[in-house]
């Protein structure tokens, strides 16, 4: 049976809709009362696992899921050993540097050497500032990253931005975009090469369903 890892959160609704176009119905995952972490499609051909977005590539890399949907931001941060099959085009956002609106910094290069930058994207943030040849101290935070500058713990943050509303409501301003991100369809490399669980039958349909 084909197993698909789907991400909790913002990408779930569009991910379910994407597979529904191919006749794989996982709408049960969207029901408010749902507490199941795995569901079968209505025709019994496939199973969906509901996991944290950061864990999708882990399940796919280790073969517990043959397919998954995950944001490009997670792929950049985790660098998993998976096959990237297609950019699905939904879930648009960007990884950006932001500071307090009252600060004098208007680009990442304006930040002082050895300042603190809070982020849950530790690898991406570190790589970005290394490219700038600007030494900074990356402070790992995994919730309410915006509080870093607000409390004075960090001069800046590196975080995902969609509409910018959260930044604005917390007195922060975006000063530089690092990269843009959308949802990607990924596959377990060996399953893809060897057509395990009929994966080769689905992939042309999946990539052809992108609109």
From Swiss-Prot:
GO-annotated molecular function: ATP binding; ATP phosphoribosyltransferase activity
SUPFAM superfamilies: Periplasmic binding protein-like II (SSF53850)
Pathway(s) of this molecule: Amino-acid biosynthesis; L-histidine biosynthesis; L-histidine from 5-phospho-alpha-D-ribose 1-diphosphate: step 1/9
Catalytic activity reported: 1-(5-phospho-beta-D-ribosyl)-ATP + diphosphate = 5-phospho-alpha-D-ribose 1-diphosphate + ATP
Keyword Acetylation in record: no
GO annotation, cellular component aspect: cytoplasm
Gene Ontology biological process: L-histidine biosynthetic process
Keyword Transmembrane helix found: no
Broadest EC class assigned to this enzyme: transferase
Keywords of the record: Amino-acid biosynthesis, ATP-binding, Cytoplasm, Glycosyltransferase, Histidine biosynthesis, Nucleotide-binding, Transferase
EC annotation from Swiss-Prot or TrEMBL: 2.4.2.17
Subcellular location: Cytoplasm
Gene3D superfamilies documented for this protein: Periplasmic binding protein-like II
PANTHER family assigned: ATP PHOSPHORIBOSYLTRANSFERASE, ATP PHOSPHORIBOSYLTRANSFERASE ATP-PRTASE
Family listed: Belongs to the ATP phosphoribosyltransferase family. Short subfamily.
HAMAP family found in the cross-reference section: HisG_Short
Oligomer and partners: Heteromultimer composed of HisG and HisZ subunits.
Function comment: Catalyzes the condensation of ATP and 5-phosphoribose 1-diphosphate to form N'-(5'-phosphoribosyl)-ATP (PR-ATP). Has a crucial role in the pathway because the rate of histidine biosynthesis seems to be controlled primarily by regulation of HisG enzymatic activity.
Domain comment quoted from the record: Lacks the C-terminal regulatory region which is replaced by HisZ.
Protein name from the UniProt record: ATP phosphoribosyltransferase
Species whose genome carries this gene: Thermosynechococcus vestitus (strain NIES-2133 / IAM M-273 / BP-1)
Primary gene name: hisG
